[in-house]
Regions:
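N-terminal nucleotide-binding beta1-loop-alpha1 segment
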Residues: 1-19, 380
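Conserved N-terminal catalytic core of the sugar/cofactor nucleotidyltransferase
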Residues: 2-5, 13, 27-116, 146, ...
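Short catalytic helix/loop segments, enriched in acidic residues and glycine
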Residues: 20-33, 400-408
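Catalytic-core segments of class I nucleotidyltransferases/pyrophosphorylases
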Residues: 100-102, 109, 115-122, 135-138, ...
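A short, conserved acidic/glycine-rich loop-to-beta-strand motif
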Residues: 124-134
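Extended, small-residue-rich solenoid/repeat segments and analogous flexible loops
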Residues: 188, 201-301, 305
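Glycine-rich hexapeptide-repeat left-handed beta-helix
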Residues: 293-390, 394
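An N-terminal, well-structured beta->alpha segment
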Residues: 379-439, 443
Length: 443
């Protein structure tokens, strides 16, 4: 059995998280959601996988490679322009023509019993088997009706309340016979629910429903992304969490440094090289990515934070999502439902009101109150130089790269033959920065 992982969507409703990262690589408990799908496929014996890509395709290929590091064989087809769910699969026809194959979304989270789904398809003789689930609000999904033998009789994509005729939805997980390729032309846009399945029903083909109560969620917006992490933390969905369970409900990666005076309240997932300083409180339903630093007396509750983040002293974050490479300085408050994109800096005593979104690389000045989302433009500090010159946190604000560029900038104003003296204290970080400044001067 082979599988197609649909991984070409732009994830526009997940922005600013997907401004620089494809949606399938958005982490759920520190592992890309598509990697959870690959794990599920491998668990059920499906190791030949084709991924359909479009948005930021190179990043997905770079992460997964040929799949050997994940116990599978992975190949790719890339859409130059979006071709719809079925049109994308048509591009992989040559790799899928030797028998029934599975189609699954690379940006949904599920622990569906794929073995049972495949067995049901094999025994029914159907041309297509669709995994279905009953939900309380079907507005965002494709709705289907089945008869008493689970044969699908009608489809409707994303109905209004007045159009709803069923609470049974299409999960986007299919087992398909390769004969369906005859319904499509390569390079044209086709959708399974709008085009192919209705045509198959019209021609009398058997399209079977497989109703499941296993966990499944479409990570279609920021709230669903946050909830998917909470569901994984609570054990509602069965998946593998990176790291070791160091105490009930607390997972930690390698080389974590947790001060004895720090508090960690389960369930929590800590990535590799996470540092929790004295007095830090990491509350329940929190995920911290690799190389995150939580400074003294900072408090994080129900916060999803990606890698390489810094949370300053007495900072307070609750029920928010913070992407990678963010610097949250001392006494900063981030409200519920807010989302901070990659590479932002929040100055000391800044306040981000609830439900605010900051697009990547935004800078919030010290003491500022952000009451509307920042999408366009960049708000920079007034000056590089403060009262004591250029100052900042070592390896957070003053990085080796920054020190090198500072030396280059200063050196560009010097005349040939001029002498510059540098000095430092005994701290290892100061020694590194000093050498970087010297290297910049000499370059």
């Amino acid at each position: 059995m082979k599988a197609v992982v649909m991984a070409g969507g732009e994830g526009s409703r997940l922005r600013p998280l997907t401004s620089r990262r494809p949606k399938p690589l958005a982490p759920v408990v520190n592992k890309p959601v598509m990697e959870h799908i690959v794990d599920l496929l491998r668990l059920h014996g499906v190791t030949e996988i084709v991924a359909t890509l479009h948005y930021l395709a190179d990043e997905i290929e770079s992460y997964f490679g040929d799949g050997s590091n994940f116990g599978v064989h992975l190949s790719y087809v890339v859409e130059d322009t979006p071709l719809g769910t079925a049109g994308a699969v048509k591009l992989a026809e040559e790799m899928l023509s030797d028998g029934p194959f599975l189609v699954i979304s690379g940006d949904a989270l599920t622990d569906l019993d794929l073995t049972a789904l495949l067995a049901d398809h094999a025994s029914s003789g159907a041309a297509a088997t669709i995994a279905l689930q009953r939900v309380s609000n079907p507005l965002e999904f494709g709705v289907v009706i089945t008869d008493d033998r689970r044969r699908i009789t009608r489809f409707l994509e994303k109905p209004s309340w007045g159009e709803i005729f069923s609470d049974t939805i299409n999960t986007g997980i299919y087992v398909l016979d390769p004969s369906l390729f005859a319904y499509m032309e390569r390079g044209k846009n086709y959708d399974f629910s709008r085009d192919l399945f209705p045509r198959m029903l019209h021609e009398g083909k058997l399209v079977q429903g497989f109703i499941t109560e296993d966990y499944w969620t479409d990570i279609g917006n920021l709230q669903q992304y946050q909830q998917a992490n909470y569901d994984a933390l609570s054990g509602r969905v069965r998946l593998t969490i990176p790291g070791s369970e160091i105490s009930p409900g607390i997972w930690a990666g390698e080389d974590c440094h947790i001060d004895p005076a720090a508090q960690v309240l389960a369930p929590v997932v800590l990535g590799k090289n996470v540092t929790l300083e004295a007095g830090a409180v990491v509350g329940a339903d929190t995920v911290l990515g690799n190389a995150t630093i939580v400074a003294k007396n900072a408090k994080l509750h129900r916060t999803i934070a990606w890698q390489d983040g810094y949370f300053g002293e007495f900072s307070s974050l609750s029920e928010c999502t913070v992407a990678d490479r963010n610097i949250i300085k001392d006494h900063v408050t981030v409200g519920e439902g807010s989302v901070i994109g990659s590479g932002c800096t929040l100055g000391s005593n800044a306040i981000v009101r609830p439900n605010i979104k900051l697009w990547p690389d935004k800078t919030v000045s010290s003491g500022a109150i952000v009451s509307m989302s920042l999408i366009y433009g960049i708000k920079w500090p007034g000056s590089l130089f403060g009262g004591v010159g250029v100052s900042g946190l070592a390896n957070v604000e003053i990085t080796p790269e920054f020190a090198l560029k500072l030396g280059q900038a200063f050196g560009s104003h010097l005349k040939p033959g001029q002498t510059v003296m540098t000095s430092r204290d005994a701290h290892p970080a100061a020694r590194v920065m000093n050498r970087c400044v010297i290297s910049g001067l000499l370059s």
